[in-house]
Regions:
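Active-site rim beta-loop-alpha module in soluble metabolic enzymes
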Residues: 121-188
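Short small/polar-residue motifs
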Residues: 152-158, 194-201
Length: 263
């Protein structure tokens, strides 16, 4: 996040007193000080029983994005716990064994962390620096754009009451429609009063003129392979969780959903 905003060299070392007192130097995850005016973002000095806040928490607070990040980024609270409480307590908090956490490790994460830790200086143009910048840019764009995306979903979408007694959220095709407007539909449902009743999402297919249909929260009471042989369905995943159709009429889309319901 910081290098996306300030594209400068990263030095991996302990800060000097001069660094900590210089607001033109961002000191992150070291130094024993949290002072946004001086651009110091360390959490290690906090009491053991304090709320789990790590360096990214403090940087997000600095940018005014922390509350939105907690709402829209499911991984953030887990990262805070892992960084401040360790894997054993984090596993207990999640209700899983520590060994299960280890099985979720990504080799991409491992390599990036190892390569970052292996250098004392990272500069513009180097792979690690550029990847870090991309992550910061994408996170900032995601957080600042999510509110607008949810507003777009609320403005465009409509709820369908299905014959099988559940709800479906439908987004019509309108122009202009942002490329990823449908990606906010799941979050919109979770924030609505109908999250327990909703079983599917229907949204414009970005690769065609029809619509995509997918399970909400992987509700297996919908089985889209049941409509895979329909003339206007050109794709139905073998696992049954998604289908794509050239149909554009609401009545036909509802018919396909009714056919896919297995209860």
């Amino acid at each position: 996040l910081l290098i996306a905003k300030y594209p400068v060299t990263i030095f991996r070392r302990e800060p000097t007193d001069a660094d900590l007192a210089d607001s033109s130097v961002c000191v992150v995850d070291v130094g024993g000080d949290w002072n946004e005016d001086l651009m110091n973002f360390d959490h290690h000095q906090f009491p053991r029983d304090s709320d789990p806040l790590c360096a990214i928490s403090l940087v997000l607070k600095h940018f005014g994005l922390y509350e939105d990040a907690h709402k829209f980024c499911d991984w953030l609270e887990v990262a805070e716990w892992f960084d401040t409480r360790g894997p054993v307590d984090t596993g207990k908090w999640l209700g899983i064994e520590r060994e299960t956490l280890s099985k979720l490790n990504s080799p991409i994460d491992i390599t990036l962390l190892r390569r970052f830790a292996g250098g004392t200086e990272h500069n513009t143009g180097q792979p690690i620096w550029e990847v870090m910048k991309m992550v910061g840019e994408d996170l900032h764009q995601y957080l600042t754009g999510m509110k607008a995306k949810l507003e777009e979903v609320a403005r465009l979408c409509e709820w369908w009451d299905m014959g099988f007694g559940k709800k479906v959220l439908f987004m019509p095709r309108v122009e202009p429609l942002s490329d990823d407007a449908s990606s906010g539909m799941g979050r919109f449902v979770n924030d609505s009063d109908f999250s327990e009743e909703t079983v599917a999402l229907v949204y414009p297919d970005r690769r065609g003129t029809g619509y995509g249909m997918s399970r909400f929260n992987d509700d297996k009471r919908l089985e889209f392979t049941k409509v895979g042989e329909e003339d206007d369905v050109h794709f139905a995943h073998a696992k049954g969780f998604i289908a794509k159709t050239s149909a554009t009429e609401k009545a036909r889309l509802k018919e396909l959903l009714e056919q896919s319901w297995v209860g």
